[in-house]
Regions:
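Sec-dependent N-terminal signal peptides
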Residues: 4-13
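Accessory carbohydrate-recognition regions in carbohydrate-active enzymes
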Residues: 19-326
Length: 326
């Protein structure tokens, strides 16, 4: 009798569907086609300054991310109304300082450092985004805290000069004018700087960038002119920098970016409060971001088993809790 009762209980247990949390109903790709730059599958926490995600369009109205385009120009940290900031992109192609237009080639003459993606690998949930970059030959993963972005790039093969591009003047919905951009090498694993940016108004974005392994060189560029192996770089207009690494197959390069609209001390404070407690544990930051969303969304309970209605409600609610910095 006891054995029969146990078998019945086990049958009932395994016959039940897994219980889903509110955050599991959110599809971050809904509403990302024919939409504004503020609406993309960005890694963010509720009301976070950082909305880290892919850009794949040229500079024009309703630019930013478009779901139907199967490439990525880079991963930008801020997607707000008339405000954007610091695009990062891994690259293993021939060195170019232009990200490339949506219609330009990916190899050879006139190619940019943008990359095609394998669309079936594009995944995401609140606080996380991932895709395989075909031309950059790596898996890109993103997560975020309030003021910080966390990147993970896992390369599929060995490369002697894999690059992480740091682009200050990239395509944006309202365009971007860099009055002054600055990078300073603090160590072979840390860079700091700022971008004095002018869109409709002026703002200065300060950034601190940390890497989990030493880079070989830091290099700056303006237009197509490159200054190699330098410690400091100041320029304007179309400018940026890049670091170079030797990487092995299946090796991950991790990048932590702390931002502030105040000063460098603000960057350091944000790093100390939001990323340092996790060390280089990308998965822990990802899970913390997901849990933050789930805690917020759980404030509204939905009775019944109508999954479609839950998807609509929790997706809409998550959209209300994104920061536009207007």
């Amino acid at each position: 009798m006891n054995k029969l009762f146990s078998m019945i209980c086990l049958s009932a247990l395994f016959g039940c569907s897994p219980v889903k949390d509110p955050v599991d109903y959110v599809d971050i790709f809904v509403g990302t086609s024919n939409s504004r730059a503020m609406l993309g599958p960005y890694a963010a926490v509720p009301y976070g300054m950082v909305q880290l995600g892919a850009d794949n369009q040229d500079a024009h109205w309703m630019g930013g991310y478009e779901y139907s385009i199967n490439n990525v120009k880079g991963f930008t940290h801020i997607h707000a109304w008339m405000m954007n900031g610091l695009m990062i992109m891994p690259a293993v192609q021939d060195l170019v300082t232009w990200e490339g237009s949506s219609s330009s080639p990916y190899r050879g003459a006139n190619a940019g450092y943008h990359s095609r993606i394998l669309k079936e690998t594009e995944k995401g949930e609140p606080g996380y985004y991932s895709v395989f970059l075909y031309d950059a030959d790596c898996q890109a993963e993103l997560t975020a805290t309030n003021h910080c972005g966390f990147h993970k790039y896992t390369f599929a093969n060995d490369y002697d000069n894999a690059r992480i591009m740091l682009d200050l003047n990239y395509p944006a919905e309202y365009g971007t004018d860099i009055h002054e951009g600055y990078f300073k090498v603090i160590s072979d694993q840390e860079i700091e700087g700022y971008a004095d940016t002018r869109v409709a108004g002026d703002y200065i974005l300060h950034y601190n960038i940390k890497f989990n392994k030493p880079f070989k060189t830091f290099n700056g560029w303006k237009d197509d002119k490159v200054e190699k192996n330098i410690r400091e770089w100041k320029s304007n207009g179309d400018c940026g920098g890049f670091v170079e690494f030797d990487v092995k197959k299946d090796e991950s390069v991790l990048v932590q970016v702390s931002l502030s609209l105040v000063d460098q001390q603000g960057c350091k404070n944000n790093y100390e409060a939001e990323l340092k407690p996790y060390g280089w544990d990308f998965d822990a930051v990802h899970q913390a971001a997901k849990q933050e969303w789930n805690t917020l969304l759980s404030k509204i309970e939905v009775e019944g088993d109508e999954a479609d209605k839950k998807k609509i409600l929790y997706k809409s609610l998550s959209g209300l809790c994104q920061t536009n910095l207007e």
